[in-house]
């Protein structure tokens, strides 16, 4: 970045920034059970060179759930951009939700991808499993803790993995996985679906997953559905 005064005289200021080694190509698909989805998400590049992907499912459906999940997502983004660490940021949001007079619960599914190293940090608070696809192999990221805003002493498990160009992260809310429980009892149909598909475009893949989940629900979603697909690519710029 260069900043120079107008005219022929003066001092120029230069700001040098290290180029990212990776970039994230993201596709999102949503389907609401009612008129307003209770799921909220955001994808943003932080000042420290990490890509923040956060998905939150407010308890219930409709406008109340949407308010809880949106507040969670917005506050997390603000705290991370201010420079807070993962544990402090999540515990701050947890405290804010617990201070509200009425019950305020929300899941947090969070991924931080280092655009220099390719390392991903996954934090899951009450959310359903996420999936990491590399070719025909699919890994599962899961946790068994309570949603945010339920207990004061919140456990924050963090899982780190190395990602390579072409790897795909798939994050979903429970409305996507739950219809498959009628098939396998666990709702992990998506793992097998991802292992079989060769689709690499995150936008098309997110639509395919939503359509499959809707078919499993026989055309009538029992809950809000959100799918985020994020592919890691080598930065050519």
Predicted features along the sequence, with ranges:
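Active-site-proximal, acidic helix/loop segment immediately C-terminal to a metal-coordinating Asp/Glu
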Residues: 60-82, 152, 163, 167-219, ...
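Short beta-strand-to-coil "C-cap" segments at the C-terminal boundary of structured domains/repeats
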Residues: 17-18, 230-236
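Short strand-connecting beta-turns/loops that link adjacent beta-strands
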Residues: 48-49, 115-117, 235
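N-terminal entry segment of metal-dependent catalytic domains or homologous docking segments
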Residues: 7-58, 64, 71, 156-159
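PP2C/PPM family metal-dependent serine/threonine protein phosphatase catalytic domain
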Residues: 17-40, 90, 94-98, 128-160, ...
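Acidic loop->beta-strand submotif enriched in PP2C/PPM serine/threonine phosphatases
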Residues: 35-49, 105-108, 140-182, 217-222
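DG-centered beta-turn motif at the end of beta-strands
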Residues: 57, 127, 172-175, 224
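Catalytic core of PPM/PP2C metal-dependent serine/threonine phosphatase domains
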Residues: 1-10, 66-135, 210, 214-223, ...
């Amino acid at each position: 970045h260069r900043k120079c005064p107008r005219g022929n005289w003066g001092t120029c200021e230069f700001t040098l920034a290290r180029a990212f080694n990776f970039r994230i190509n993201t596709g999102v698909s949503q389907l609401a059970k009612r008129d307003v989805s209770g799921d909220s998400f955001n994808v943003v590049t932080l000042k420290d060179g990490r890509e923040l992907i956060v998905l939150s499912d407010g308890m219930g459906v409709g406008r109340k759930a949407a308010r809880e999940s949106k507040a969670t997502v917005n506050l997390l983004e603000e705290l991370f951009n201010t420079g807070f660490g993962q544990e402090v940021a999540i515990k701050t949001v947890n405290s804010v939700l617990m201070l509200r007079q009425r019950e305020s619960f929300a899941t947090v599914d969070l991924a931080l991808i280092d655009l220099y190293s390719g390392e991903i940090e996954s934090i899951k608070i009450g959310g359903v499993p996420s999936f990491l696809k590399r070719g025909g192999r699919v890994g599962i990221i899961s946790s068994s803790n309570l949603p945010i805003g339920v207990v004061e002493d919140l456990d924050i498990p963090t899982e780190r993995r190395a990602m390579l160009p072409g790897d795909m992260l798939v994050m979903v809310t429970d409305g996507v996985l739950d219809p498959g429980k009628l098939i396998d009892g666990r709702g992990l149909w998506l793992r097998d679906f991802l292992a079989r598909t060769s689709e690499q475009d995150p936008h098309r893949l997110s639509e395919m997953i939503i359509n499959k989940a809707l078919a499993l629900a026989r055309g009538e979603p029992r809950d809000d559905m959100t799918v985020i697909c994020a592919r890691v690519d080598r930065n050519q710029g």
